[in-house]
Amino acid sequence: LGREFDVFIPLNLERKEHARLFDYDIDDTVRQVFLLARRPMDRSKRTLLFIDEIQNSPNAVALLRYFYEDYPWIHVIAAGSLLLTLLEQHISFPVGRVQYMRLNPCSFADFLQATGNGLLREEVENLSVNAALHDMTMRLFSEFALVGGMPEAVARYAENRDIVALHDVYDTLLRSYSEDVEKYAKTETMKNVIRLLLKSGWTYSTEQITLGNFAESNYKAREMGEALRTLERTYLLELTYPITTYVLPAIQEHRRKPKLFWLDAGLVNYAANIQQEVMFSDNIMDTWRGKLAEQLVAQELLSGKTDADTHRDFWV
C-alpha cells in the first residue's frame, strides 16, 4: 500500500522514540514525524502515515482527530492487535473521525495474486475456471489450505515454495501471541487460561465447545468464557453461536454451545500439528475429519469484509 503514495512514513509505537512524537500538539507532532523520516513537508505529495501498535499511546489516539481536521492531506492508518481493549481502559477514538476496519488473513484470491497467478485469480473470481485449469486451481488451493493466509507466511512461500521454511514464521506469531498475554490479561488466572487456549485450543477449531473444563482443564465456564472473549476482542478467534430459526431476523442462540473459529488455517495446521496430514491429503474435504475445510470456508466468508463488527453464523 505504501508504494501507492508519494511519501510513506511508518511508525511503531512500541518504540519509545516513536511514541514520544505524540506527546506534543498536532503541529509539533507532524513536524517531528517528518523530521524523523527525513522528508520535507509537501502538501502536493500524497502522504501515508502508518502508525502501528497505536494502543501504546493514548496521546496518539487523541491526535487522530486533528490529523483529520488540520492535516487532511496526510492519510493515516492506525493499527494495533489490542485496539478493542482500549475501550476497557476508557480510551476512546475520535467520534466521526475514524473509520474502523478489521484486517483479515489473505484470501485464496490474494494467495493466487501473491504467487504469480493473477490471471487465474481473475478466472476464479469470475467463476469461469474451465476444465483445463481445474486441476491446477485445485493444486494451488491445496497449497493455500496448507500455508494459510498470514501475510508473512504467504510472502515467504511465494519466494521459495518451501513449507518447512515457514515454521519460524508460525513460531514467531504464536510466541508473540503468548507474550502479549501480559498486555490483556487482568489476573494471574486469566493469564493461565489464555496460555492454555494458545497451547491447546487450536485442536478444537470449528468444534462446538463446552466452556467449563475446556481442553480437559479444571477451569470453570466463567473463567474460560472471559479468556475466550478477551482473545475474541483481539480477532485471534471467534465464538460463533448457532441459529435455530427458519425466519428473519436470524438471531444467535447464546444459550447453546458456540463453535470456535481461529484466525487462520495455516496457524491451525501448524499449532495443531496436522501439517503432514494436510500435505499428503488427496481431498481437503476429508482432511482432519472435515474440520480444515470448515475453517477455510469460515475464513473465506470474511475475506473482503472490513467491518469490525462482522461475525459469522451457523445453523443447526
Regions found by a protein language model. Give the residues of each.
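Short glycine-rich substrate-engagement loop in P-loop NTPases that contacts/grips substrate
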Residues: 11-45
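Accessory nucleic acid-recognition modules appended to NTPase machines
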Residues: 158-316
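Structural recognition of the conserved hydrophobic beta-strand(s) that form the central parallel beta-sheet
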Residues: 50, 75-81, 102, 111
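Sensor-1/coupling segment of RecA-like P-loop NTPase cores
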Residues: 70-91
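P-loop NTPase Walker A phosphate-binding motif
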Residues: 1-7
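Conserved P-loop NTPase "ATPase switch" module shared by AAA+ and STAND
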Residues: 41-60
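Interdomain motor-coupling "hinge/lid" segment immediately C-terminal to the ATP-binding subdomain
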Residues: 88-204
